[in-house]
């Protein structure tokens, strides 16, 4: 008798699971889950990696906080752009960096930005100010936090490090910024940026 009850229970559970899977598959929620699974499991492109000996031939600059001043360091680098700027950022609330990006757009530099989805709700995010300046700003909606802090200038210079583009990073936190002038390395970062953009549609 116990065996029959156990068998019945197993069949009943399998039946319920089958219905649930069927409903999910044909509902908007189920479709969203499936699409998110597809996006998150899309294999990333193969991007060239670099070792120290290769990078040692590049021109490298650094900035650290404290003391403050790295936002100006970054803004000055943005001011050197002549053709293009690609940014991938988690936090984007610094006024000086925002102004430098808007100035670059105004002088004819192609500026493209991908921001973490948290910027849609953050009170001090410069998302809308950048959009009003006609800068192409996309939201990185791929599952997980878009925690990159990267700026690619003229496809030959990379700004990266721990430094979020925020006032807190400049005034309160212990952070670092590194600028590497190397066209091949910049292309590696650009391919990663383009990959993230493509995965967001």
Curated annotation (Swiss-Prot):
Keywords: Hydrolase, Lipid degradation, Lipid metabolism, Secreted, Signal, Virulence. It is found in: Secreted. One of its GO terms (molecular function) is phospholipase D activity. The gene is pld. Residues 1-25 form the signal peptide. One of its GO terms (cellular component) is extracellular region. It comes from the Bacteria. Homodimer. The active site is at residues 147, 149, 154. It is an enzyme of class 3 (hydrolase). Belongs to the phospholipase D family. It comes from Rickettsia bellii (strain RML369-C). The keyword Lipid metabolism applies. Residues 142-169 form the PLD phosphodiesterase domain. One of its GO terms (biological process) is lipid catabolic process. Its EC number is 3.1.4.4. Could be a virulence factor. This is Phospholipase D.
């Amino acid at each position: 008798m116990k065996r029959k009850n156990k068998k019945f229970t197993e069949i009943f559970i399998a039946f319920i699971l089958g219905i649930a899977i069927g409903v999910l598959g044909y509902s908007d929620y189920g479709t969203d889950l499936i699409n998110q699974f597809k996006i998150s499991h899309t294999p990333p492109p193969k991007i060239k990696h670099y070792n120290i000996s290769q990078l040692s031939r590049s021109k490298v600059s650094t900035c650290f906080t404290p003391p403050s001043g790295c936002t100006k360091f970054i803004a000055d680098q943005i001011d050197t752009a002549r053709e293009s700027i690609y940014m991938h950022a988690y936090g984007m609330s610094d006024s000086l960096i925002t102004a430098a990006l808007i100035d670059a757009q105004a002088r004819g530099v192609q500026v493209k930005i991908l921001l973490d989805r948290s910027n849609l709700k953050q009170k001090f995010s410069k998302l809308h100010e950048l959009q009003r300046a006609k800068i192409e700003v996309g939201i990185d909606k791929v599952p997980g936090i878009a925690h990159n802090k990267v700026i690619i200038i003229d496809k030959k210079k990379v700004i990266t490090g721990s430094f979020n583009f925020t006032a807190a990073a400049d005034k309160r936190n212990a952070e670092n910024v590194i600028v590497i002038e190397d066209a091949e390395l910049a292309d590696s970062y650009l391919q990663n940026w383009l990959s993230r953009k493509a995965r967001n549609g």
